[in-house]
Amino acid sequence: MKKIGLFGGTFDPIHNGHLHIARAFADEIGLDAVVFLPTGGPYHKDAASASAADRLAMVELATAEDARFAVSDCDIVREGATYTFDTVQIFRQQFPSAQLWWLMGSDSLMKLHTWKKWQMLVRETNIAVAMRQGDSLHQTPRELHAWLGKSLQDGSVRILSAPMHNVSSTEIRRNLAGQGVSDGIPPAAARYIREHGLYEK
């Protein structure tokens, strides 16, 4: 059975922390592919600083060297707010027999019960969680306790051994705006940022 990982984010910009956790996601779950899904109009986050077209281009450039990585614009071309459940449904229709895995950080896990149709979502996809520094499963809201306990036991939720890197896109944007420093950004994406004058003051 084909295993497909889905990795949504604003990627504003994509950085080495994203690539590191995507590789760990692929390695630990044994995925055939990881599909990066830059958001169009994300419901749970503030507006991005770069356009959707620029963020998509940067992700395509940054992921080109790993054959397991693919990029989809399905969240960008949809109008209005994009919800994870709707995105997963698109991939379920495309790959009806595949095992789907959705990657999220532990901060998102703690809010999962507030997501649109979350109980239907977790029936359609498995969940891989990258823990952020300082987070613990003991902090999980009580609304998720029964589901999480069962899902950890049956393997439909996996906690990755690789932690989420403590890299902030906000900090990277600040460095780019203030000093033009592109540390932590994949070289191909850094070149694109310079060539297109992104994140300048």
Curated annotation (Swiss-Prot):
GO biological process: NAD biosynthetic process
Pfam families linked: CTP_transf_like
EC number(s) reported in the record: 2.7.7.18
Keywords from the named record: ATP-binding, NAD, Nucleotide-binding, Nucleotidyltransferase, Pyridine nucleotide biosynthesis, Transferase
Annotated catalysed reactions: nicotinate beta-D-ribonucleotide + ATP + H(+) = deamido-NAD(+) + diphosphate
Cross-referenced InterPro entries: Cyt_trans-like (IPR004821), NadD/NMNAT (IPR005248), Rossmann-like_a/b/a_fold (IPR014729)
EC class: transferase
Biological or metabolic pathway of the protein: Cofactor biosynthesis; NAD(+) biosynthesis; deamido-NAD(+) from nicotinate D-ribonucleotide: step 1/1
Keyword Mitochondrion annotated: no
Sample GO molecular function, one term: ATP binding
Family stated for the protein in its record: Belongs to the NadD family.
Role: Catalyzes the reversible adenylation of nicotinate mononucleotide (NaMN) to nicotinic acid adenine dinucleotide (NaAD).
Name under which the protein is recorded: Probable nicotinate-nucleotide adenylyltransferase
Species per Swiss-Prot/TrEMBL record: Neisseria meningitidis serogroup B (strain ATCC BAA-335 / MC58)
